[in-house]
Amino acid sequence: MDYISNTPSEKEAMLKKIGVENVEDLFKPIPDDVTFKRPFNIPPGLSELELKRMIKSKAARNISMEEQICFAGGGAYDHYIPAHIDHLISRSEFYTAYTPYQAELSQGVLQAMYEYQSMICELTGMEVANSSLLDGGSATGEAVLMASRISRKKKILMSRGINPVYREVARTYGRPRGLEFIDLGLNETVTDMEELEQKLDEDTGAVVLQYPNFFGSIEDLNVVKNLISARKRTLLIIVVNPLTLGVLKPPAEFGADIVVGEGQVLGNPINYGGPYLGIMATRKRYVRQMPGRIVGATTDSDGKRGYVLTLQTREQHIRRARATSNICTNEALNALTAAIYMATMGKKGIKEVGEQSFKKAHYMADRIDDMEGFEVVNKDNFFHEFVIKTPLPSAEIGERLKRKGILGGLDVSRWYSFDGFLVCTTEKRTREEIDGYLEALEVISSD
């Protein structure tokens, strides 16, 4: 409905009805020392032209990937997005963040979500996927809660090789539910498997690893699979970058019970703060513990194929005590974007993106490792991200590269006790851009 403000007479009638003299009486329970009393500093209204100028001026302070050459990763990646994707998702019948509430009236949207789920299952090797969560971090948190419900255990072993933001989100989700999080240390840039073996016991509800991990290193999931298979009701959660799965073995082959990840790489642009896309897939026997919505295919009484919301285990649809999640906003538009991207690229295209990213990263790492004062920490075991030790503090390296128009990487000392620079390449980076980065490093280190 249209918003129409209340008139003074309407306000007076409402106040009289509830038995108070003025609006201020409604706020008397608020302590006086925390009550905001000074006037709001709100400027006068602007015309449309003035407002556009103001917004453009503020937006000009942002730096886009068109203005800087991006060699940063750590959870958000600068991949090429085919031009037609934005056109298709902007169609009026698609352009909303929500899976439809009157599902049967929106067969096209539901079919798109069904295709998205099917392609996520094909990438991960899992049996069922939901129609999206908020982002990679929230998907990790939901996976931990889901694993605890299934295993009926509270102890969670979580590798320090997982994106540190994801780890913090998972703790935020799990601690109010009484979950106990125990970190698994690192052997350089991979999970310490001996420590995993020592800490893994019958009380462990889940083991969580990332593949490739935050440093770009590829964990030995065969070892993890063998360790967990000897335990009853201990689930394996694997956090993935879906674009690497065109080259790497799918998590299902390592016995994964729940697979989650960030779907930004599947056609969604880099945005500070999102919106991004949470991916989740699991085994069929766990489907009723999966949060979010699941679209299924069926036939009507005439034998015609149709799409329905098969499961909606959220608190808005069923009793709160039985709900698996209270997730409210749904990233349906981002999932649609991912579906169009995967359909556009196909198996061959997704594999090529992964291979190009891999080869360019290894070319770059080999060159950096040969430079005086630089060392690639995980040069023998990474996908398209790697950690380098630099002759200057990583924060300084990053700032000086930024002045040259290069987003050079991430300073991992923000989250870890060692100084390292996390560098990433994707299929977008050209030989000239990589060589320019290397030249910039040489100049910076020699100053």
From Swiss-Prot:
Signal peptide boundaries: none
Keyword match Oxidoreductase: yes
Protein name: Probable glycine dehydrogenase (decarboxylating) subunit 1
Organism lineage: Bacteria, Bacillati, Bacillota, Clostridia, Halanaerobiales
InterPro entries, A to Z: GcvPA (IPR023010), GDC-P_N (IPR049315), GDC_P (IPR020581), PyrdxlP-dep_Trfase (IPR015424), PyrdxlP-dep_Trfase_major (IPR015421), PyrdxlP-dep_Trfase_small (IPR015422)
Entry annotated with the keyword Oxidoreductase: yes
Example of a GO biological process term: glycine decarboxylation via glycine cleavage system
UniProt function note: The glycine cleavage system catalyzes the degradation of glycine. The P protein binds the alpha-amino group of glycine through its pyridoxal phosphate cofactor; CO(2) is released and the remaining methylamine moiety is then transferred to the lipoamide cofactor of the H protein.
Record GO terms (molecular function): glycine dehydrogenase (decarboxylating) activity
Organism: Halothermothrix orenii (strain H 168 / OCM 544 / DSM 9562)
Keyword annotations: Oxidoreductase
Enzyme type, top EC level: oxidoreductase
UniProt family annotation: Belongs to the GcvP family. N-terminal subunit subfamily.
Pfam families in alphabetical order: GDC-P
Complex formation: The glycine cleavage system is composed of four proteins: P, T, L and H. In this organism, the P 'protein' is a heterodimer of two subunits.
Catalytic activity line of the entry: N(6)-[(R)-lipoyl]-L-lysyl-[glycine-cleavage complex H protein] + glycine + H(+) = N(6)-[(R)-S(8)-aminomethyldihydrolipoyl]-L-lysyl-[glycine-cleavage complex H protein] + CO2
